[in-house]
Amino acid sequence: MVAQHVNESSIEVRPMSVHIGAEISGVDLSHPLDPAAVADIWAALLRWKVVFFRGQELDHAAHVSMARQFGTPTPGHVVFGGHQEYPEIYSIAKHRTANSTKTPPTIRPWTGWHTDITAAINPPRQSILRSDVVPPYGGDTQWVNL
């Protein structure tokens, strides 16, 4: 599939499949975005439902700052809360509860299809996932347009 420039910003959108997913390049998410870039990213998200930004160096502060350019972030998780300093962030790391319990974390194999945080009365309209550690192979996150 062919990458395309969108509107007036310098971003490039490259579809990753026929129906869902696109990679966006030509933007540095660690700095404030101009209104044209925000509009183009939003348009790509509406069209492709899932967008990917590779090679971005974001810490928690930059992650939340970037998210605020697209709306008001919600608490990281309605039941389990979020990060102490950044309540908008909820870790989905495998061992995230290791320090909050006296017993070792339970490692369970995949237990079925699920969608994150959608049981909330007012679920977020989108989620922003950021990977701190990217395995060399074996990632199996899947996306669906419900």
What does each of the following model-derived ranges do?
Residues 2-146:
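Non-heme Fe(II) oxygenase catalytic core, chiefly the N-lobe of the double-stranded beta-helix
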